[in-house]
UniProtKB/Swiss-Prot annotation:
Residues 1-22, 126-228 are annotated as: Disordered. Belongs to the RRP17 family. The keyword Nucleus applies. Residues 171-180, 204-220 have a biased composition (Basic residues). The keyword Mitochondrion does not apply. GO terms for cellular component: nucleolus. InterPro entries: Nucleolar_protein_12 (IPR019186). It comes from Danio rerio. Pfam families: Nop25. GO terms for molecular function: rRNA binding. The gene is nol12. This is Nucleolar protein 12. Keywords: Coiled coil, Nucleus, RNA-binding, rRNA-binding. It is found in: Nucleus, Nucleolus. Residues 158-170 have a biased composition (Polar residues).
Length: 228
């Protein structure tokens, strides 16, 4: 009896030991769900924007580098120009103000002959010194002006492509016009030939029209003689 009672008590204890789990309800936020589903497109647009910004920055850097290189070349040319002008001024001064001294020794006295040559190069250039100086100042002001900014290479490529397409269209139109003119000339020549041939045939028919009585009599006389 004791064993059976224990088995019954164990079975009751196991059956009553099961616990019921509570229900789990999942709630989705529509906004977060939409953001998750459209995230691929957003990331694609962001990558595209980043690529465009990177291209713009590279283009700006390239333009800046080209401007700096042009500015350096311009300064170098300006320096060379100034050196050439200075050398020309020195040469002009050396030519326009030269002195030669020659001494002749005699037993009683000494003779010194000094030759001073003062050439005016402005006469050869047909310019006065003041005007020439003013022109040099204007040239220097012009050379000291800053260089123009380089154009946009992308826009220049687009303009080149547009001009090429326009030129091709113009050439095609010219070719079509030439073909039409040639066809019109050929048609006019053919029509002239036809009209000339028809006129020639008509004239022959007119010439071969009805014969006169005199011609018929002569023809009948010839026939009678041939029969005899």
């Amino acid at each position: 009896m004791g064993k059976s009672d224990r088995l019954q008590q164990g079975s009751k204890g196991k059956g009553g030991g099961k616990r019921k789990h509570g229900k789990c309800v999942l709630m989705f936020d529509d906004k977060d769900r939409q953001d998750f589903l459209t995230g691929f497109h957003k990331r694609k647009l962001e990558r595209r924007r980043a690529a465009l910004e990177e291209m713009k920055s590279k283009l700006k850097e390239e333009q800046k580098r080209l401007r700096e290189e042009r500015h350096k070349e311009y300064l170098k040319m300006l320096q060379e120009r100034r050196q050439a002008l200075d050398e020309a001024d020195e040469l002009e001064e050396a030519i326009t103000a030269t002195t030669e001294c020659v001494q002749y020794d005699h037993p009683n006295h000494t003779v010194t002959v000094t030759t001073i040559s003062d050439l005016d190069l402005s006469a050869d250039r047909l310019l006065e010194p003041a005007q020439r100086d003013g022109g040099d100042g204007e040239e220097r002001e012009r050379t000291e002006a800053l260089p123009k900014q380089a154009g946009n290479p992308l826009l220049s490529k687009k303009i080149q492509s547009l001009t090429a397409s326009l030129n091709s269209l113009v050439k095609q139109k010219k070719r079509r016009k030439q073909k039409r003119r040639q066809e019109a000339k050929q048609r006019s020549h053919q029509s002239d030939r036809k009209s000339s041939s028809s006129a020639f045939v008509h004239n022959n028919k007119q010439k071969q029209g009805k014969s006169t009585k005199r011609q018929r009599r002569r023809q009948t006389g010839r026939n009678e003689r041939s029969q005899d």
